[in-house]
UniProtKB/Swiss-Prot annotation:
Single GO cellular component term: extracellular region
Signal sequence residues: 1-19
Role: Ion channel inhibitor.
Name of the featured protein: U7-theraphotoxin-Hhn1a 7
The organism's place on the tree of life at top rank: Eukaryota
Tissue localization of expression: Expressed by the venom gland.
GO MF term (any one): ion channel inhibitor activity
Propeptide: 20-50
Keyword Nucleotidyltransferase: no
Location of this chain's protein in the cell: Secreted
Keywords attached to this entry: Disulfide bond, Ion channel impairing toxin, Knottin, Secreted, Signal, Toxin
UniProt record similarity statement: Belongs to the neurotoxin 10 (Hwtx-1) family. 13 (Hntx-13) subfamily.
Chief localisation class: secreted
Length: 90
């Protein structure tokens, strides 16, 4: 009986150590992924957009793209760019 209890306690200790190692590895991966996302986000912010895209917030100083129009939609409390039922010419 003592051997069985000792084996169970030892197995639980091994599982605890393995899960701690897995958590540390997962945290390192998530930090690396977060850094990568922030780098991509910073790179995209440097590019100036000349128009707002679909469902983007729009005002007079932030116009929508050519195939979109700025409209007020009820559940949203600000104007958004919606499709004006035309297609952009290439």
């Amino acid at each position: 009986m003592k051997t069985a209890i000792f084996t169970v306690v030892l197995a639980l200790a091994v599982f605890a150590v393995l899960s701690f190692g897995w958590e540390a590895n997962e945290k390192a991966l998530s930090e690396g992924f977060t850094e990568l996302i922030h780098e991509k986000e910073a790179a995209s912010e440097t590019e100036a957009r000349e128009c707002r895209y679909f469902w983007g917030e729009c005002h007079d100083h932030m116009p929508c793209c050519d195939w979109l129009v700025c409209r007020y939609k009820w559940p949203i409390t600000y104007n958004i760019c919606v499709w004006n039922r035309t297609f952009p010419e290439k």
